[in-house]
Amino acid sequence: MSEKKINLLDLDRKAMRALFADLGEKPFRADQLMKWIYHFGVSDFEEMTNINKVLRQKLAARCEIVAPEISSYQKSTDGTIKFAIHVGEGQEVETVYIPEDDRATLCVSSQVGCALECTFCSTAQQGFNRNLTVSEIVGQIWRVSHFLGFAKETGERPITNVVMMGMGEPLLNLANVIPAMDIMLDDFGFSLSKRRVTLSTSGVVPALDKLGDALDVALAVSIHAPNDELRDILVPVNKKYPLQEFLAGIRRYIAKSNANRGRVTVEYVMLDHINDSTEQAHELAQLMKDTPCKVNLIPFNPYPGSPYGRSSNSRIDRFSKVLMEYGLTVIVRKTRGDDIDAACGQLAGDIRDRTKRLAKKRMQENQISVTMN
């Protein structure tokens, strides 16, 4: 039985250099190889013309460059593209490309499903199967870049920003997310600015501290409620890491960070008559008074079976005006890709749910139906 080949997309520069040392090669050879992979999108060692033939043969014998494949894609009327990415065992995660005039953002997944149970999120209702590997995370960027077209002559990449806001909670997969983001930031990797790579979290506080010790990227935090009582329902991880503990962790992170320029982005999904009253806006402003931030209000994007509705424009407007009275910077996110279920909270993929969450939900619904009948 032949030995399994090393997928080079799993290796950050430190690991890549260690591999080359094991091959008896100098560190700069690893840098050359990474440039071929991430700047020019090359996966065939024979195309790497500044690497000698003997080394190319060694690499071909021991290594491979394999990104997950695109199973299908849908294009929105606004230009947003949602990709279904095959990650084995019949499972898919979803990745979303969002083009704008001044940037091109890719929303990347970190898990097959999600282990958290946020009640307004479609991904959470699908359950959880496993963490994505480094190659499956960076492979989403690599594969979509291929789809959009690497600039072979200049090395210019078609993606300018990456947000870890797809399927999954990134802080529950730190072992793979940290090296993946290292590759995104590395000059020989995707060469993105730390201000153009954003990680979004629902508040796994110990892992947030570990992230802050490991690297510096922009941080977005999913708050979604102005108090623990409501957040316990909407974002159940709050029962383990309540708001004040989460906010203290956020302040520790931004104290270390240059990428955040001294403040964090607060994400707040607007749920009709659930968390969108003017009283709750005052409460949110008071909650955030000691945590430098800008607030991103996200109109809820319904999905089949969702128990919530989207706040009206007038309620969102009143809510935002209250926050601005406190001197907060407020942005109402423009919904992108909702006609193809690619908007915030709508990603579902195709998941073999190890948590059996959907099955349990259906059983509960059947029990309720029997009781009512």
Swiss-Prot record:
Residues 100-339 form the Radical SAM core domain. Keywords: 4Fe-4S, Cytoplasm, Disulfide bond, Iron, Iron-sulfur, Metal-binding, Methyltransferase, rRNA processing, S-adenosyl-L-methionine, Transferase, tRNA processing. Its main location: cytoplasm. CDD domains: Radical_SAM. Pfam families: Radical_SAM, RlmN_N. It catalyses: adenosine(2503) in 23S rRNA + 2 reduced [2Fe-2S]-[ferredoxin] + 2 S-adenosyl-L-methionine = 2-methyladenosine(2503) in 23S rRNA + 5'-deoxyadenosine + L-methionine + 2 oxidized [2Fe-2S]-[ferredoxin] + S-adenosyl-L-homocysteine; adenosine(37) in tRNA + 2 reduced [2Fe-2S]-[ferredoxin] + 2 S-adenosyl-L-methionine = 2-methyladenosine(37) in tRNA + 5'-deoxyadenosine + L-methionine + 2 oxidized [2Fe-2S]-[ferredoxin] + S-adenosyl-L-homocysteine. One of its GO terms (biological process) is tRNA methylation. GO terms for cellular component: cytoplasm. Its cofactor is [4Fe-4S] cluster. The keyword 4Fe-4S applies. S-adenosyl-L-methionine binds at G168, E169, S200, S222, I223, H224, N301. Belongs to the radical SAM superfamily. RlmN family. Specifically methylates position 2 of adenine 2503 in 23S rRNA and position 2 of adenine 37 in tRNAs. m2A2503 modification seems to play a crucial role in the proofreading step occurring at the peptidyl transferase center and thus would serve to optimize ribosomal fidelity. NCBIfam families: PRK11194.1, rRNA_mod_RlmN. Reaction proceeds by a ping-pong mechanism involving intermediate methylation of a conserved cysteine residue. This is Dual-specificity RNA methyltransferase RlmN.
